[in-house]
Amino acid sequence: MGQKINPLGFRLGTTQSHHCLWFAQPKNYSGGLQEDEKIRDCIKNYVQKHMRVSSGFEGIARIGIQKKIDLIQVIIHIGFPHFLIEGRARGIEELQINVQKKLNSVNRRLNIAITRVAKPYGQPTILAEYIALQLKNRVSFRKAMKKAIELTEQADTKGIQVQISGRINGKEIARVEWIREGRVPLQTIRAKIDHCSYAVRTIYGVLGIKIWIFLDEE
């Protein structure tokens, strides 16, 4: 059987960097990870509730977290900031209050910044959300995959592979369907590949979406 390594972990230190930057004592490490998860969940819930169109489409590419002794710096890389109802300044202020309440940390300041992603459809997380939305609306999975590939062409990517697994179209037996366009050299470490795995709940059960995007070669 083929052993599939995570493309992001495989390239750490070469073309990929960590999304979280902080240090902790071994006994406090698990608490730090849980704190990161709380911050991410809180931000995703807030963005979902405050979208102009209540579609469940968040458009968050990634959330970067940097921790110091007295400061937590959170950078949200978002694809479509104009979808948010509140103005940027007021929205960030409200979000900061929400996250601060959730964390319950008195000694540390929280600073949240929103950065717009230049080419949103070159981000696998945003593409996976788009496909998930299509599948929820009962669009044919092949049509959704082909449309996602068309969208990545706008972002000047060199290749993309999309895979959907589970009870596709409500069939009794689960299967895997995939489509590839261009080159996706998974074994080349210098190849800058972005990856995302995403689970979507449909009326037939949970489907898994995996996306690999080949951006460039160093």
From Swiss-Prot:
Its main location: plastid. It is found in: Plastid, Chloroplast. GO terms for cellular component: chloroplast; cytosolic small ribosomal subunit. Keywords: Chloroplast, Plastid, Ribonucleoprotein, Ribosomal protein, RNA-binding, rRNA-binding. Coiled coil: none annotated. Residues 47-118 form the KH type-2 domain. Disulfide bonds: none annotated. It comes from the Eukaryota. InterPro entries: KH_dom-like_a/b, KH_dom_type_2, KH_sf_prok-type, Ribosomal_S3_C_sf, Ribosomal_uS3_bac-typ, Ribosomal_uS3_C, Ribosomal_uS3_CS. One of its GO terms (molecular function) is rRNA binding. The keyword Transmembrane does not apply. GO terms for biological process: translation. NCBIfam families: rpsC_bact. Part of the 30S ribosomal subunit. Belongs to the universal ribosomal protein uS3 family. This is Small ribosomal subunit protein uS3c. It comes from Illicium oligandrum. The lineage of its organism: Eukaryota, Viridiplantae, Streptophyta, Embryophyta, Tracheophyta.
